[in-house]
A protein has these predicted regions:
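Conserved aromatic-histidine-acidic binding/catalytic patches
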Residues: 56-64, 161, 165, 169, ...
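Amphipathic interaction/junction segments at domain boundaries or subunit interfaces
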Residues: 64-70, 74-164
């Protein structure tokens, strides 16, 4: 991937919140040291990661966030367990105001036929595997526009974390999907995840009444 404005923006948006959470668990001097090292790790991870389509692919954002999480984890150099890193990630992002705005905007468009038709096309296209490091998915229409499903056959986040030798972070990041659903104003049902060794991830979203 390119270390472009998009990649820099993810770091700029979230690094302050990560620093605040790390101060709680590691203390201010260590938190500052970890975040200084994080910027170097993040840049290297982004540059050595294969592209999944850049800003043209909405899921690039997910992979960039995973790269930042991996960078913080590596920069902590054993001072955070995977579970602690998962909590740090969840708390940091949930306390970022831009995240809440983004999820509210996401909810408005995701529960429309126009977005769902576009997402279905993206899912069909993903099976061509033009970007091997990316996601492969199927889209499932609900009975109304107020519900839909996405079944992931391959996960770009899991692939990145595996390449970076920190696959143990994947199940922790999966838990954040339920936080995202909360801010989207919907219920998420999921019985399987690739991160936990299943063959797929079966997301089902239903808008709250």
């Amino acid at each position: 991937m390119e270390f472009d404005l998009y990649a820099r923006g993810v770091s700029l948006l979230l690094s302050g919140s990560f620093r605040r959470q790390l101060k709680v668990s590691l203390g201010e001097p260590t938190a500052n040291e970890v975040m200084r090292r994080t910027q170097r790790f993040y840049r290297k991870i982004v540059l050595r990661s294969p592209s999944i389509g850049g800003s043209e692919n909405p899921l690039t954002l997910n992979v960039l966030i995973a790269a930042l999480v991996a960078a913080v984890y590596k920069a902590a150099d054993g001072r955070l367990s995977s579970e602690q890193m998962g909590k740090t990630f969840s708390d940091a992002v949930e306390r970022t105001l831009a995240f809440k705005w983004f999820m509210q905007a996401t909810a408005k468009k995701n529960f429309t036929r126009q977005w769902q038709d576009r997402r279905n096309v993206q899912a069909i296209e993903s099976h061509r595997r033009i970007y091997p490091a990316g996601f492969v998915s199927d889209f499932v229409y609900g009975k109304t526009v107020n519900e839909y499903g996405v079944t992931y056959r391959e996960c770009g986040i899991c692939k990145l974390l595996l390449r970076e030798n920190c696959a143990e972070l994947a199940p922790q990041m999966c838990q954040f999907d339920f936080v995202m659903a909360k801010y989207m104003g919907c219920a998420l049902t999921r019985t399987k995840t690739i991160a936990n060794g299943d063959e797929l991830c079966d997301f089902w979203f239903a808008k709250n009444s």
